[in-house]
C-alpha cells in the first residue's frame, strides 16, 4: 500500500473528534495568512494564464469545451455522466489542467473557493493547501451546500456521490490506475476529513466513502473478468502449453490481478486514513454514514472486508450513544447474517458480540430495538445462540410499545411455534409440522406460562396473531375444544381455558376489534378494503361456529373461567346467516343456553357477558329469530323478578341472604343494559331496605344500586315521553325521596355507629352524587319538569362531605383478599373523590363550600387523589375567571384542621404532619403560578395575599402563622412593587403594637417581612448586575474565553502565538480590575440603607 506523503503531518490527534462548528483550526504559523492571500491571488492569475497561454482551438479540432464542474454537481444530475466524459477527454489532453479543475471542484464542494495553479500542482504541498482552507473556514468564507435549504441545492449530496461514481467508472480503463490522479484526490479528501470544520469533514467523508464503494464496483467487475480469463487460460493450456494465445491470456490475467490489487490498496488507504477516524466523529451523521458504508463494503466485497479486522467496527458501534448509528450497525449485520455463506466467517464476531445484540432488543430507541429483534432472528436461524439466552426477550411480549411486541411475536412464532430455525423433528412425530393442530398445540404450551393472568394471555395472543395462520383456523380450534381432533387428543382443563381465550381474542382481531388498549385513545379508522375483509371474516366465523356453538356452550357452561368468553362470541357473528343457512334451530338453542348460563352464574363477568349477548341477539337478529330472542329476554326478566321476590321472602323467613345477593347482582347487570321498569319491584326493594336494617353490607349496596338504576331509567323514560303526566312525575319524585331517605339513614348510621365498612360508604357517596346530578335544578328550569329539580340542603351536603373526607383517609392499597373481589374498581376511595369533584364541576351544589373543602386535601392522600383534585382545579380554572376565593378558603380549611389538632392536645407527630400538609398545600397552589402565569393572574395572586393578610390579623397574633405558611408562597410570586405595597401594609398594622409581649406569637409576622425584604433585595441585585454587565459591554468588547485549541499539524503550532494569547488574557484581566468600583459597591450600599430603615421602623 502506498503511504500518504503527508502521513506524519496528518496524524490524528484524539481531540480531533471534538467539533468546531465555527471552523477554527489549530493555530498555524505566519505563513497561513500569506497562503490565504496567495491562493486568492492565484485564482485571478489562473484565469489570466488560461486566457493568455491557451491557444484558441481551431474549428477543425474537437477539443472538449471547458466547464465548471461544481455547477454541474449543483445543477441537473442527469448531465453528470456527460460532464464526466468531457472531463476525462480533457484529462487525456491536459492532465495537470484537468486535475486542478477536479481539485477545485473538490474544494468548492466542501464550501471553499480555492484553486491550485496547474503548473504548480506537483510542487504544492497538501498540508499547506488544507491549512489555507481551514483558515478560510475560520474567516467565515465558507458555504455549506449539504445543509443548505436552497431549492437548487436539494440534490447536491446525491449529485456529488453520482459524480464520483461516474468518474471512477469512466476512468477504469485509464486514469484510475495511473497512480497519480486518484492518489492526489485521496490525499486531499483524507486530509480534509481530519480538519475541525464540520462541513469539511462531512463532505470529505461523503466523497471518501463513495470512492471505496465505487472502487468495489470496479473491483467486482475486474474480478469477474479475472475468473473468465482464468477459465479461458485453463482451457487453452490443456490444448497447448504455450503460444501467443496463452501468452495473451497470461498477460491479461496479470494486468487484471494488478489492477485489483491497486484498487484494494486504495480502499485500505481510505479506510485507514479516513474511516478509522470518522467512525467515531462527534457528528452523528458522519458516524452513521461510515457504518452504513462499511456494511455495504463487507456485503459487496467480502474477500477483503469480511474479516474481524473490519467487522469489529460494527460490533463497537452497537454501543454508540446515537440511536441512528446503532440502528445502522444492526441493519448492516442483519444483511450480513442473511447470507448463509457469510456465517462461518462470522463465528468469532458472533461469540464476541451476540450478548450485546440480544440486549439491544430492549434498546431505548424503539426502531433500534425492532432491528435488534430482527437480528436475533437471524442468529437463531443459524443456531448461533442458545435458547437459554432468550429469556429476557420473551418478557418483551408484554411490553408497552406495539412495535416491540409485534417484533417479539414474530420471533416467538418463527422460533417456538413454526420452529423454522429448528432442525430437530417435531415433538409430535408422524405429523405434518406445519399443520394448524401442531401450531396451536405449541401456542398452548406458551400460554401455560401465563395461565394465571388472562390479560397477559391476551397480550401474547395479540403479539403472535398476525403471523400465525392457525389462529384463524376456526374449525381446527373448535374440533380441539370438542375433543374431536384425533391428532391432538383431549385437552386438559388449563389448555381448554387458554384455547377458548385464544378463540375469543382471535375472533375479535379477525373482525377488527382492538383488544389491547392504546395509550393515545385515538379512534380506529379502517379502509374500505379492511372493512370488507372483516365482513368476510365475520361470515367465515359464523359458518364455522353455527352448528358447533350450542355444543361448546353445553360443554363449558358450568365453567366460570370459560363461559364469559364463550358466550360473547355470538356478538361477532353474522346472525342473518342462520336464516340463510337454515340453521334457525341452532340459533334458538344458543339463545336458550345463554339464558340458562345467566341463571347458572352469579359472577360479574359471566353475567355481563350473558346480558350483552342476549340483548345483541334481541336487537341485531331479524324476523322470527328476533322475535324469539326478545321473547327469551322477556322471559329472563320475568324469571329474575320472580327469583328476587322469592329470595326476599326467604330473607323475611330468616333464611340465608345469598340467593337475594346473587339475584340483585343479576338485576343490576341487566339494568346496566336495559330498563326494568316494574314498579312493584322498586317498592319491594325499598320495603326490604326499610324493614331489615341488619342485612349484609354487600346486599345493602346492591339494593341501593338497583333503586338508583330504576330511578335513572324512569327519569329517562319521562324525559323522552311526548305526553308527561302529573302522576308519573309524582311517582318519580316519591321514589326519589324514598331513595334519599334510605341513603340518609345509612349515612347517619355510618357516622354514628361505624358498623359498616368502606364498600357501603363509597357506594353511598357515588349514588348520592349521581342522583343529585340527575336531578340538579339547572336541568329542569321551566315547564312541567321543573318539579324534578333538586338541591341538597346544607346539613345533607355536610354529612356527604364528612363521609367523603373519611374515605379520603382510607388506604389506597388493596388487600390481597380484596384483589379478586368483584366491583373492586367501583368501591375504592377514588370513587368518593370523583363523586365530590363531579358535584362541584357540574354546579350541582354551591362550589364555595365543597370546592375549597376538596382542594384543601391536595397532596394529602397520595398521587391518585392528588391527580383527581388537580383535574378539578384545571377544570375550574378554565370555567372561572377568578378562583382566588376558592384558593383562600381551601387554605383556611387547612389552617382550621391544624388549629383543631393543636388545641385538642393530640400527639406532636400528628400536629407536625398536619402543619406540613398545610404547607405543601400552599406550595402546590402557589406553584401553579409560574412563568407568564404570574403576570396573567397577578390580580388573583394579589387578592389571595391581601385577603389572607386580613384574615391573619383578624385575631393577631393567634392567626399570624397563616401569614408565614399560607400567604408567603403566594406573596413571593408577585412583582417587587407589589411586594413593597404588601410589606408596607403589614408594617402599618404593627406600628402601634407592642410585639415584645408575645415574641413567639409575632415571629411569623417578622419572618414574613424578612422574607419579602430578601426577595426585593435579590431582585434589585440581579437588576444591578444586568446593568453593570451592560455598561461593561458597551465600554469594551467581551472577554474571549480561553479554550484548548485543536491543532491540525503539530509543527505549525508556534509558541509565539500561544504567548500572545496568554498576554491577551492578562490584559483582559487587568481591564476587569480597572472597572469602576461604583458598580461593585452599589448593591452593598443599598443593602445597608435598607437595613437602617428597618431598624428605625422597629
UniProtKB/Swiss-Prot annotation:
The keyword Disulfide bond does not apply. It holds the Pfam family STAG. It is found in: Nucleus; Chromosome. Its main location: nucleus. Residues 1-68, 1027-1077 are annotated as: Disordered. Expressed in roots, mature leaves, buds and seedlings. One of its GO terms (cellular component) is nucleus. Keywords: Cell cycle, Cell division, Chromosome, Chromosome partition, Coiled coil, Mitosis, Nucleus. It comes from the Eukaryota. Residues 275-360 form the SCD domain. The keyword Methyltransferase does not apply. Residues 1040-1050 have a biased composition (Basic and acidic residues). Residues 245-265, 632-653, 888-908, 1009-1032 form a coiled coil. InterPro entries: ARM-type_fold, Cohesin_Scc3/SA, HEAT_SCC3-SA, SCD, STAG. Disruption phenotype: The null allele scc3-2 is embryo lethal. The weak allele scc3-1 exhibits mitotic and meiotic defects. Heterozygote plants are dwarf and partly sterile. Reduced chromatid alignment during interphase. One of its GO terms (biological process) is meiotic sister chromatid cohesion, centromeric. Belongs to the SCC3 family. Part of the cohesin complex. Interacts with DEK3. Essential component of cohesin complex, a complex required for the cohesion of sister chromatids after DNA replication. The cohesin complex apparently forms a large proteinaceous ring within which sister chromatids can be trapped. At anaphase, the complex is cleaved and dissociates from chromatin, allowing sister chromatids to segregate. The cohesin complex may also play a role in spindle pole assembly during mitosis. Required for centromere cohesion maintenance at anaphase I and for the monopolar orientation of the kinetochores during both male and female meiosis. Also involved in mitosis. This is Sister-chromatid cohesion protein 3. It comes from Arabidopsis thaliana. The gene is SCC3.
Amino acid at each position: 500500500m502506498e503511504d500518504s506523503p503527508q502521513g506524519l503531518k496528518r496524524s490524528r490527534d484524539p481531540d480531533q473528534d471534538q467539533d468546531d462548528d465555527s471552523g477554527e483550526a489549530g493555530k498555524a504559523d505566519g505563513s497561513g495568512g500569506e497562503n490565504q492571500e496567495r491562493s486568492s491571488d492565484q485564482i485571478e492569475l489562473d484565469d489570466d494564464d488560461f486566457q493568455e497561454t491557451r491557444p484558441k482551438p481551431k474549428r477543425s479540432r474537437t477539443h472538449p469545451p471547458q466547464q465548471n464542474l461544481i455547477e454541474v454537481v449543483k445543477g441537473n444530475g442527469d448531465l453528470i455522466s456527460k460532464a464526466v466524459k468531457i472531463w476525462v477527454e480533457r484529462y487525456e489532453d491536459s492532465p495537470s489542467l484537468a486535475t486542478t479543475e477536479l481539485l477545485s471542484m473538490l474544494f468548492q464542494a466542501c464550501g471553499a473557493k480555492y484553486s491550485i495553479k496547474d503548473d504548480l500542482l506537483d510542487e504544492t504541498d497538501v498540508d499547506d493547501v488544507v491549512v489555507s482552507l481551514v483558515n478560510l473556514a475560520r474567516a467565515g468564507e465558507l458555504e455549506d451546500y449539504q445543509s443548505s435549504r436552497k431549492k437548487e441545492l436539494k440534490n447536491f449530496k446525491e449529485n456529488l456521490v453520482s459524480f464520483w461514481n461516474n468518474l471512477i467508472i469512466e476512468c477504469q480503463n485509464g486514469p484510475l490506475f495511473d497512480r497519480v490522479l486518484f492518489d492526489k484526490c485521496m490525499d486531499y479528501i483524507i486530509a480534509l476529513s481530519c480538519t475541525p470544520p464540520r462541513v469539511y469533514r462531512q463532505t470529505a467523508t461523503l466523497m471518501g466513502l463513495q470512492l471505496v464503494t465505487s472502487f468495489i464496483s470496479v473491483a467486482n467487475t475486474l474480478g469477474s473478468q479475472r475468473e473468465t480469463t482464468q477459465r479461458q487460460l485453463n482451457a487453452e493450456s490443456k490444448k497447448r502449453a504455450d503460444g501467443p494465445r496463452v501468452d495473451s491470456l497470461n498477460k491479461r490475467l496479470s494486468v487484471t490481478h494488478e489492477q485489483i490489487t491497486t484498487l484494494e490498496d486504495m480502499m485500505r488507504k481510505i479506510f485507514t486514513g479516513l474511516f478509522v477516524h470518522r467512525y467515531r466523529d462527534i457528528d452523528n451523521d458522519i458516524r452513521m454514514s461510515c457504518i452504513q458504508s462499511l456494511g455495504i463494503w463487507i456485503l459487496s466485497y467480502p474477500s477483503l472486508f469480511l474479516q474481524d479486522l473490519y467487522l469489529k467496527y460494527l460490533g463497537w458501534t452497537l454501543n454508540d450513544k446515537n440511536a441512528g448509528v446503532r440502528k445502522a450497525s444492526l441493519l448492516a449485520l442483519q444483511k450480513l447474517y442473511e447470507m448463509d455463506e457469510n456465517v462461518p466467517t462470522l463465528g468469532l464476531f458472533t461469540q464476541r458480540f451476540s450478548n450485546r445484540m440480544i440486549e439491544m432488543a430492549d434498546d431505548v430507541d424503539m426502531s433500534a430495538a425492532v432491528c435488534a429483534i430482527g437480528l436475533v432472528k437471524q442468529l437463531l436461524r443459524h443456531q448461533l445462540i442458545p435458547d437459554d439466552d432468550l429469556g429476557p426477550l420473551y418478557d418483551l411480549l408484554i411490553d408497552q410499545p406495539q412495535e416491540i411486541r409485534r417484533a417479539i411475536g414474530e420471533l416467538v412464532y418463527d422460533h417456538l411455534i413454526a420452529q423454522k430455525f429448528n432442525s430437530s423433528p417435531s415433538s409430535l412425530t408422524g405429523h405434518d409440522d406445519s399443520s394448524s393442530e401442531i401450531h396451536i398445540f405449541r401456542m398452548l404450551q406458551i400460554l401455560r406460562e401465563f395461565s394465571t393472568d388472562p390479560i397477559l394471555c391476551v397480550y401474547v395472543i395479540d403479539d403472535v396473531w398476525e403471523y400465525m395462520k392457525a389462529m384463524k383456523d376456526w374449525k381446527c380450534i373448535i374440533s380441539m375444544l370438542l375433543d374431536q381432533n384425533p391428532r391432538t387428543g383431549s385437552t386438559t382443563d388449563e389448555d381448554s381455558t387458554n384455547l377458548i381465550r385464544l378463540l375469543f381474542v382471535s375472533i375479535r382481531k379477525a373482525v377488527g376489534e382492538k383488544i389491547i388498549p392504546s395509550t393515545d385513545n385515538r379512534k380506529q379508522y379502517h379502509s374500505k378494503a379492511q372493512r370488507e375483509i372483516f365482513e368476510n371474516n365475520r361470515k367465515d366465523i359464523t359458518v364455522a361456529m353455527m352448528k358447533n356453538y350450542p355444543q361448546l356452550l353445553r360443554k363449558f357452561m358450568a365453567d366460570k373461567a370459560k363461559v364469559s368468553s364463550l358466550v360473547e362470541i355470538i356478538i361477532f357473528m353474522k346472525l342473518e346467516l342462520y336464516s340463510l343457512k337454515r340453521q334457525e334451530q341452532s340459533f334458538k338453542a344458543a339463545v336458550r343456553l345463554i339464558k340458562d348460563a345467566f341463571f347458572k352464574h352469579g359472577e360479574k363477568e359471566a353475567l355481563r357477558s350473558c346480558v350483552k349477548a342476549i340483548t345483541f341477539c334481541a336487537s341485531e337478529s331479524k324476523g322470527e329469530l328476533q322475535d324469539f330472542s326478545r321473547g327469551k329476554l322477556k322471559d329472563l326478566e320475568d324469571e329474575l323478578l320472580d327469583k328476587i321476590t322469592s329470595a326476599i321472602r326467604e330473607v323475611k323467613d330468616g333464611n340465608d341472604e345469598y340467593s337475594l345477593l346473587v339475584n340483585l347482582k343479576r338485576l343490576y347487570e341487566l339494568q346496566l343494559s336495559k330498563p326494568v321498569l316494574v314498579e312493584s319491584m322498586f317498592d319491594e326493594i325499598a320495603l326490604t331496605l326499610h324493614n331489615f336494617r341488619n342485612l349484609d353490607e354487600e346486599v345493602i349496596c346492591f339494593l341501593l344500586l338497583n333503586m338508583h338504576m330504576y330511578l335513572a331509567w324512569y327519569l329517562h323514560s319521562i324525559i323522552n315521553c311526548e305526553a308527561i303526566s302529573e302522576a308519573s312525575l309524582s311517582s318519580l319524585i316519591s321514589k326519589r325521596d324514598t331513595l334519599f331517605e334510605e341513603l340518609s339513614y345509612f349515612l347517619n348510621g355510618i357516622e354514628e355507629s361505624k358498623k359498616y365498612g368502606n364498600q357501603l360508604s363509597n357506594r353511598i357517596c357515588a349514588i348520592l352524587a349521581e342522583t343529585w346530578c340527575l336531578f340538579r335544578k339547572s336541568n329542569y328550569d321551566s315547564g312541567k319538569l321543573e318539579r324534578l329539580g333538586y338541591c341538597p340542603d346544607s346539613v345533607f351536603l355536610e354529612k356527604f362531605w364528612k363521609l367523603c373526607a373519611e374515605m379520603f383517609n382510607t388506604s389506597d392499597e388493596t388487600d390481597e383478599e380484596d384483589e379478586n373481589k368483584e366491583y373492586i374498581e367501583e368501591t375504592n376511595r377514588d370513587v368518593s373523590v370523583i363523586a365530590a369533584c363531579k358535584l362541584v364541576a357540574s354546579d350541582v351544589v354551591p362550589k364555595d363550600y365543597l370546592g375549597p373543602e376538596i382542594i384543601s386535601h391536595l397532596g394529602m392522600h397520595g398521587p391518585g387523589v392528588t391527580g383527581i383534585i388537580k383535574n378539578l382545579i384545571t377544570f375550574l380554572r378554565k370555567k372561572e375567571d377568578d378562583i382566588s376565593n376558592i384558593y383562600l378558603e381551601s387554605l383556611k380549611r387547612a389552617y382550621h384542621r391544624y388549629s383543631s389538632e393543636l388545641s385538642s392536645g393530640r400527639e406532636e407527630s400528628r400536629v407536625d404532619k398536619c402543619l406540613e400538609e398545610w404547607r405543601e398545600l400552599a406550595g402546590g397552589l402557589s406553584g401553579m403560578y409560574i412563568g407568564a402565569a404570574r403576570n396573567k393572574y397577578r390580580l388573583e395572586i394579589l387578592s389571595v395575599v391581601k385577603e389572607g393578610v386580613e384574615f391573619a390579623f383578624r385575631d393577631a397574633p393567634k392567626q399570624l402563622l397563616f401569614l408565614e405558611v399560607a400567604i408567603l408562597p403566594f406573596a413571593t410570586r408577585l412583582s417587587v412593587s407589589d411586594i413593597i405595597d404588601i410589606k408596607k401594609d403589614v408594617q402599618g398594622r404593627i406600628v402601634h403594637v407592642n410585639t415584645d409581649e408575645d415574641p413567639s406569637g409575632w415571629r411569623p409576622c417578622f419572618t414574613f417581612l424578612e422574607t419579602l425584604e430578601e426577595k426585593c433585595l435579590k431582585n434589585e441585585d440581579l437588576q444591578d448586575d444586568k446593568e453593570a454587565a451592560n455598561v461593561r459591554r458597551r465600554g469594551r468588547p467581551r472577554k474571549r474565553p480561553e479554550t484548548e485549541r485543536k491543532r491540525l499539524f503539530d509543527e505549525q503550532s508556534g509558541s509565539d502565538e500561544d504567548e500572545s494569547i496568554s498576554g491577551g488574557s492578562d490584559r483582559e484581566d487587568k481591564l476587569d480590575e480597572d472597572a469602576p468600583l461604583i458598580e461593585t459597591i452599589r448593591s452593598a450600599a443599598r443593602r445597608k440603607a435598607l437595613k437602617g430603615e428597618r431598624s428605625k421602623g422597629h
